[in-house]
Regions:
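Conserved glycine-rich cofactor-binding loop
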Residues: 13, 20-21, 44
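Substrate-binding pocket helix/loop in short-chain dehydrogenase/reductase
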Residues: 99-100, 104-109, 138, 194, ...
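Active-site loop immediately N-terminal to the catalytic Tyr-X3-Lys motif
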Residues: 101, 148-154, 176, 209, ...
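C-terminal substrate-recognition "lid" of short-chain dehydrogenase/reductases
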Residues: 120, 210-239, 244-245
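Active-site helix of classical SDR
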Residues: 123, 159, 167
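Alpha-helical segment proximal to the catalytic Tyr-Lys
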Residues: 128, 172-176, 230
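Residue(s) in the substrate-gating loop at a strand-loop-helix junction
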Residues: 143
Length: 246
């Protein structure tokens, strides 16, 4: 699909977690198109280099920082190596579905670590600096699973509902100092080729009767990151094709 190039993020630095593929990569590319310098986070240096090269090929600025978001020391190092961050996109996430009674505790703990604890400690490290400067934007990437029940989705849905609760609390804590905090609750999005049938099945349940392209969600994220959304904070924006409305 077509992409839009603006310049309203010139001079700003954005950190996008999980930015080496799928939705995170689309977000990183669009933020760069809008003028931001992007810190691309991921675990795989090869994929990170590919994303950085894709951004630079379009005339953007980017660098890669590797980190394991299930490791608290790595999270703190990621924040330090990112430097001054004006836009934080907590996109990285993991998911596993399964019956509650049979759900493995180690899998549950890892989902909580990556999906909830990592955003918490990145905000803890970076939001005070934003507040001291009087501006900043934090965008948390959630899912319809945070508000719609799915069989086997209790653990994953809980992590996304928690992230949306953090958005509200961080709004109360940081927005008086000029830091805007919002959530994008994404619907089914084509991010992994091997799960296309799943996306299509869930997409058929939406009002638009289709799944989203990553770029469609990325446009919502970059809007919230920009001055065009200067009066928007504490919101959970449902970019879900109308799934939660019907």
């Amino acid at each position: 699909m077509s992409t839009t190039k603006r310049s309203d993020l010139q001079g700003l630095t954005a950190l996008v977690t999980g930015a080496t593929a799928g939705l995170g990569q689309a977000i990183a590319l669009q933020l760069a198109r809008d003028g931001a310098e992007v810190v691309v986070h991921g675990r795989d240096a090869t994929h990170g280099a590919q994303t950085v090269e894709a951004i630079r090929a379009e005339g953007g600025r980017a660098r890669f920082v590797a980190a394991n978001l299930s490791n608290l020391a790595d999270i703190k190092r990621l924040a330090e190596e990112s430097g001054q961050v004006d836009i934080l996109v907590n996109n990285a996430g993991v998911y596993t579905f399964g019956p509650t009674a049979e759900f493995d505790i180690s899998v549950f703990d890892n989902m909580m670590a990556v999906n909830v604890r990592a955003p918490f400690y990145l905000v803890a490290a970076l939001a005070p600096g934003m507040a001291a400067r009087g501006s900043g934007s934090i965008i948390n990437i959630s899912s319809i699973a945070g508000s719609v029940g799915f069989v086997g989705g209790a653990a994953y849905g809980a992590t996304k509902a928690a992230l949306e609760a953090l958005t509200r609390s961080w709004t109360a804590e940081f927005s008086p100092s000029g830091v805007r905090v919002n959530t994008v609750a994404a619907g089914p999005t084509y991010t992994r080729p091997d799960e296309r049938e799943l996306y299509e099945a869930i997409g058929a349940t939406t009002a638009l009767k289709r799944a989203a392209q990553p770029e469609e969600i990325a446009e919502v994220v970059t809007f919230l990151a920009s001055p065009r959304a200067s009066y928007v904070t504490g919101a959970t924006v449902a970019a879900d094709g109308g799934r939660t409305a019907i």
